[in-house]
A protein has these predicted regions:
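Nucleotide-sugar donor-binding/catalytic module of glycosyltransferases
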Residues: 1-223, 227, 335
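C-terminal subregions of glycosyltransferases and related glycan-biosynthesis enzymes
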Residues: 208-336
C-alpha cells in the first residue's frame, strides 16, 4: 500500500549531528504514513553513506539512493520526485528540524483546501545552534502570494508540501538553476495559475549560521534570482534593465554596502513596478506595498545610516494602519 506522504531529502556534507536531528524529526512525526526518500549526493564520503545505511536498516520507511557521482541539489531533488509514490510530496533539508506535527498539519491543510497545489509553513530559526524567533512572516493566502512573489520566494523550501499529481503532470525543478531552484519552480507554477498557501504557524526550525553563504555562492544565487525575476516581469510584458535587476536583488546581496541613497533607489524602482502591476488584476497593491515596506525595513536594519534610512521608510508611502503595525512589529522584533 502506497504511503500518503513522500518526504524527500538530499544529503551532501551536513554534519552528522545535524543530520541525525533532521532525520529523527521526520521519523518521529505524529503522522506515520509516509515514505522517506533520502538521496546521498556525496558517494565518496563513506562516513555519511554508512551513517545513512544504518538508518535505512532500522526503519523500513527509508528509501536510500546513493548517487554514482556528485550531481548537485537540483538533479538530486528531481531523482526524489521520480521515486515519490505518495499522494503528497514533502521537502526536507538535511540540517533543519521538523516540529512533531508538521506532516499531520500540512496533510490536513491540503485535504481541507483542494484548490491549493503547494503548501508551505512559517519557520523559526536555529542560529549558532540556538532557536531564535526572528522576524519572518510569510503570506498565507494565494492572492497575497501572487501579489508579492516578484519580491521574494513565497515559501521556506524545506517546509513545502505539494500534490504528487503535479510531478505526473510534468512539473519538476529546472536543472539549469544551481541555486534558487525552488523559487524558479514556484514562480512558474504561480504564473501558470496554480494556487498556493502557507500554514500560518511555524512548523520547522530553519538552520542558519554566520558565514553560511560564501560570497561566491551568493553571487550565483543573485544571478539565478535575476533570471527568475526577469522571467516574471517578461510574462507581465515589462522589460527591465540589468541595472534595475541588480537593484531588485539588493536585499539578498550578503556583502552589499547599504546606504540611504541605495535604499531610496530601490524604493523608486519598486514604486514604479507597483504602478505597472496595478494593470494586473491578479495583483493586490496593498499586499505588494506591505511586502515592499517589509523589505525596506530589512534594508534599513543593514544601512550605514539607519536613522536617515528609517526616516525615508516612514515617508515612502502614506502609511496605513497595517503598515504602521508592521513597522512597530519590526522594531519590537529587533529589540526583543
Amino acid at each position: 500500500m502506497e504511503a500518503v506522504v513522500s518526504v524527500i531529502m538530499s544529503v551532501f556534507k551536513e554534519p552528522q549531528e545535524y543530520l541525525k536531528h533532521s532525520i529523527d524529526s521526520i521519523l518521529t512525526q505524529s503522522f506515520k504514513d509516509f515514505e522517506f526518500i533520502i538521496i546521498c549526493d556525496n558517494p565518496s564520503d563513506n562516513n555519511i553513506c554508512n551513517f545513512l545505511k544504518v538508518y535505512k536498516s532500522i526503519d523500513y520507511r527509508i528509501k536510500l539512493v546513493i548517487n554514482p557521482t556528485n550531481m548537485g541539489l537540483t538533479k538530486s531533488l528531481n531523482i526524489g520526485l521520480k521515486l515519490a509514490s505518495g499522494k503528497y510530496i514533502a521537502r526536507m533539508d538535511a540540517d533543519d528540524i521538523c516540529m512533531h506535527e508538521r506532516l499531520y498539519k500540512q496533510v490536513a491543510y491540503l485535504e481541507n483546501n483542494p484548490e491549493i497545489s503547494v503548501c508551505g509553513t512559517n519557520r523559526y530559526y536555529i542560529v549558532n545552534d540556538k532557536v531564535v524567533k526572528k522576524y519572518n512572516i510569510l503570506f498565507e493566502k494565494n492572492g497575497d502570494i501572487v501579489s508579492t512573489f516578484l519580491l521574494r520566494s513565497p515559501f521556506t523550501h524545506p517546509s513545502v508540501m505539494f500534490r504528487t499529481i503535479l510531478v505526473k503532470e510534468g512539473w519538476k525543478y529546472n536543472e539549469n538553476f544551481e541555486c534558487a531552484q525552488d523559487y524558479e519552480l514556484w514562480s512558474r507554477m504561480i504564473l501558470s495559475g496554480l494556487k498556493m498557501g502557507n500554514v500560518s504557524e511555524p512548523l520547522i526550525y530553519y538552520r542558519v549560521s554566520s558565514g553560511q553563504i560564501s560570497c561566491k555562492k551568493n553571487a550565483i544565487q543573485l544571478e539565478c534570482a535575476k533570471r527568475i525575476k526577469k522571467n516574471i516581469l517578461k510574462s507581465w510584458n515589462y522589460s527591465i534593465s540589468d541595472s534595475e535587476l541588480s537593484l531588485l536583488v539588493l536585499p539578498y546581496q550578503v556583502d552589499a554596502i547599504i546606504t540611504t541613497s541605495r535604499i531610496k533607489k530601490f524604493g523608486t524602482l519598486v514604486s514604479n513596478l507597483g504602478i505597472v502591476l496595478d494593470k494586473n488584476e491578479l495583483i493586490d497593491r496593498d499586499s505588494f506595498d506591505l511586502e515592499v515596506l517589509r523589505t525596506l525595513m530589512l534594508l534599513c536594519s543593514r544601512s550605514t545610516s539607519r536613522i536617515s534610512s528609517f526616516l525615508y521608510c516612514l515617508t515612502y508611502k502614506k502609511l496605513s494602519y497595517n503598515n504602521l503595525k508592521e513597522i512597530f512589529r519590526f522594531i519590537i522584533s529587533r529589540i526583543v
